[in-house]
């Protein structure tokens, strides 16, 4: 099933301080992984693809 990335990322980023940036990266990760972890942080074991995407510096790409 296709997930609603906008809706899932709005939920995921609802408590983020850098809300726009959170939404941008969550959106990229959601498009690639078709999964956004539950809650507003953590729970990344539910979405291994989301958890394992790295940015250019080797850190976590997905919020």
Curated annotation (Swiss-Prot):
<keyword id="KW-0020">Allergen</keyword>
<comment type="similarity">
    <text>Belongs to the GASA family.</text>
</comment>
<dbReference type="Pfam" id="PF02704">
    <property type="entry name" value="GASA"/>
</dbReference>
<protein>
    <recommendedName>
        <fullName>Cypmaclein</fullName>
    </recommendedName>
</protein>
<dbReference type="InterPro" id="IPR003854">
    <property type="entry name" value="GASA"/>
</dbReference>
């Amino acid at each position: 099933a296709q997930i609603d990335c906008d809706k899932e990322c709005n939920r995921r980023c609802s408590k983020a301080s850098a809300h726009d940036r959170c939404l941008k990266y969550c959106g990229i990760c959601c498009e690639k992984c078709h999964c956004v972890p539950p809650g507003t942080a953590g729970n990344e074991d539910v979405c291994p693809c989301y958890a394992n995407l790295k940015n250019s510096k080797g850190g976590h790409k997905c919020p």
